[in-house]
Amino acid sequence: MKFCPMCGMSQFKSGLSSCEFCDYEEKPIEKLSKQEIYDLMAPYEYEWVEGGARILGVKNNRDLALRGSVAIPHFVTEIAEDALSHCKFLARIELPKNLRSIGDRAFAHCRDLFDVFIPESVSHIGKGAFADCYDLGVICAAAPSQPDGWDSEWLLDCSARVEWSSIDE
């Protein structure tokens, strides 16, 4: 099960490209209108990078912007250092299947975060990416083992265990 990036409803089933609740339809970034891009990126500060977008941070109040279950838009390829840290009411995060990089402390201090699936496309995770995520008991990763590009201390100050070769449901 995955979450719709527009409405956050969990009924956005894997393998489908549209949401039955809000009529969102997943399209390649080249086919999105400026308004569709704005709507998807509304809570985030971002910049365009080769092949997609990098989330730099959260606009306004982190506690109001990211709460409960959140799906990162499908055209985001990088999450910058400290970008989503201190979002204390963030519980679940769905990372896009083409995400390449998670920066240092990107999700640090997200104390309610309990559900993360890391897609196999992620070739870099920085130091302390999930530091002080106290509710995070298990991190599911699609990779069969820790990729070379992941910092040896990516789980610094995080007691979660990693389930390798996991499948996103």
Task: Identify the residue ranges that each predicted region occupies.
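Structural signature of tandem-repeat unit edges
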Residues: 32-53, 62-78, 88-101, 111-124, ...
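Short Cys/His-rich micro-motifs in 6-15 aa windows
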Residues: 22-31
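Short functional micro-motifs and their immediate structural scaffolds
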Residues: 12-13, 27
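Short cysteine-rich clusters marking metal-coordination/redox-active sites
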Residues: 4-7, 19-22
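A structural signal for leucine-rich repeat
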Residues: 131, 152-155
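Residues immediately within or flanking Cys/His clusters that coordinate Zn2+
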Residues: 1-2, 16
